[in-house]
């Protein structure tokens, strides 16, 4: 089975329990990271057109929609029907006018230069073809636009890294599997983080995709990183 199909099936299966487990297992630190990213994204008073890629159940999408200027348009896409279905229910309860769509990040169904901002919250490591996904996001980003990526990473500090791996490789799969009934999904999470390129390799990939200015910020001892890529205005 291709990675894309496996990831879709896995997230379809864990979608009903995903939100509850995600916040418990991350100790709610993920909320703090998202707030930082949203501040970076919603940095202009004008209405923005925003695409949230790999939106999952819509947590990041919702925060963005609540913070951007009035009149903005926010769209979320994910490959998992199950995750999108949960997100649609959440949006309906909140009364937010946000469109969630099932779509492949490697073949986005939008015209060139369509969005002022693009976000990816903890999903870029799930791309089957990372370079293609980055190129697609660059394609649909408008000139002068900004891409903000949040992604988990391995801390550089030896003690923090030891604690991190103990939690990620032992505790998380056990608890996640116990609650969701799908231990494999919570074994995939740490393995996908360990395989994902560090800043020294990922930043050049953003450059190769076309982003003119790229930077990254380390959050919470390097457990999470925020990557920012800007498309030339001309």
Report residues per predicted region.
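C-terminal alpha-helical "lid/dimerization" subdomain adjacent to the S-adenosyl-L-methionine
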Residues: 5, 150-205, 209, 215
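A short acidic, Gly/Pro-enriched loop at the edge of an enzyme's catalytic core
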Residues: 106-117
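Short glycine-dipeptide loop
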Residues: 70-71, 141-146
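A short glycine-rich, Lys/Arg-flanked "PGG" loop and its adjoining helix->strand segment in the class I
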Residues: 131-143
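Conserved alpha-helix/loop element of class I SAM-dependent methyltransferases that forms part
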Residues: 27-48, 63
